[in-house]
Amino acid sequence: FRGLAKLLKIGLKSFARVLKKVLPKAAKAGKALAKSMADENAIRQQNQ
């Protein structure tokens, strides 16, 4: 059980490291996606 907890800690640390690398990119992608969705909504409302 102790070994499992150790593995979990190591896994979480590496996961956190990956998240730190990926998060800024994901945030940028999310903003771009939100903006394009908002633009689509605006276009749709104008067409109605």
From Swiss-Prot:
Highest taxon of source: Eukaryota
GO BP terms, alphabetized: defense response to bacterium; killing of cells of another organism; monoatomic ion transport
Keyword terms, alphabetized: Antibiotic, Antimicrobial, Cytolysis, Hemolysis, Ion transport, Membrane, Secreted, Target cell membrane, Target membrane, Toxin, Transmembrane, Transport
Primary role: Disrupts cell membranes, particularly those rich in phosphocholine, through formation of pores. Has antimicrobial activity against Gram-negative bacterium E.coli, Gram-positive bacteria B.subtilis and S.aureus, and hemolytic activity against sheep, pig and guinea pig erythrocytes. Has insecticidal activity against S.frugiperda ovarian cells by opening non-selective ion channels. Enhances the insecticidal activity of spider venom neurotoxic peptides.
GO molecular function: toxin activity
Name of protein: M-oxotoxin-Ot1a
Assigned GO CC terms: extracellular region; membrane; other organism cell membrane
Membership in a protein family: Belongs to the cationic peptide 02 (oxyopinin-2) family.
KW Secreted (keyword) present: yes
Record's subcellular location: Secreted; Target cell membrane
Presence of keyword Membrane: yes
Tissue: Expressed by the venom gland.
